[in-house]
Amino acid sequence: MNKTTSFKLSVMMFLEFFIWGCWFVTMGTFLSQAFSASGGDIALAYETQSWGAIVAPFIIGLIADRYFDAEKILALIHILGGGLLFMCSVALGFDKFYPYILIYMILYMPTLALVNSIAFRQMKNPSKEFPKIRVWGTIGWIVAGLVISYGVGWESSQKLEYTFYLAAIVSVTLGLFSFSLPKTPPQATNESPSLREILGLDALKLLKDTRYLVFFISSILICIPLAFYYQDANLFLNELGVENAAGVMTL
């Protein structure tokens, strides 16, 4: 993989997770402050991530991997996503906000697989090359939290709707940038995908490996408190009076 490709993939990862980090951590606080949302409403908003993850295999397995170039699908999704994030920022109530964030997450979650697919397809030695690319996603998430808290101060000034503005702008930027990414055509196949393949059920064979089974179970258990953390931690810290809570959580 040459330096130009490596740079483009790193930028892709940075922007991909910067977008998510802009609004996801502080969404609970935003909903509480802007709409006086109940705990149930906040839970519904964060639940959209799960719905997006459920739908993602159908979009990736049935459509993106077989009929279209991955970078073009990524571009289209992020451009559309930018519009949805903007609508989230101007929504006048939770009942208006929820449909936009639900549709957005159904579109966004598949992009997590798309960016990995685009990256892996350009690599000759993924085990060594991928970590250097993927780490820029983590950096993007961290930078987003620092910008919101310490950079522009939207959290302390209770202007968290601007986090969706910023995410919308960066989403469209990534969408346009995606057209410059290395061409990643669908892998040729003459066979129609089975439902088993679309859902990735063949991957369950990996559970026969005891080490992988332990990893799988551990991941599920870890994600249970993690869901509560993202949903409630920022709101909790803000109610305690912790300054720049999103930045503190990031660090």
What are these regions (language model features)?
Residues 1-3, 181-216:
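Juxtamembrane intracellular "pre-TM" segments in multi-pass secondary transporters
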Residues 2-50, 211-248:
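Helix-loop boundary and gating motifs at the non-cytosolic
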Residues 3-6, 89-101:
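Helix-loop junctions at membrane interfaces in 12-TM secondary transporters
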Residues 14, 84, 94-114, 118, ...:
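Hydrophobic core of transmembrane alpha-helices in multi-pass small-molecule transporters
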Residues 44-62, 250-251:
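Central cavity-lining transmembrane alpha-helices of secondary-active solute carriers
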Residues 55-69, 152-153:
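Helix-to-loop junctions at the C-terminal end of transmembrane segments
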Residues 72-86:
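Structural signature of the two symmetry-related core transmembrane helices
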Residues 148, 166-188:
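C-terminal membrane-cytosol helix-exit motif in multi-pass small-molecule transporters
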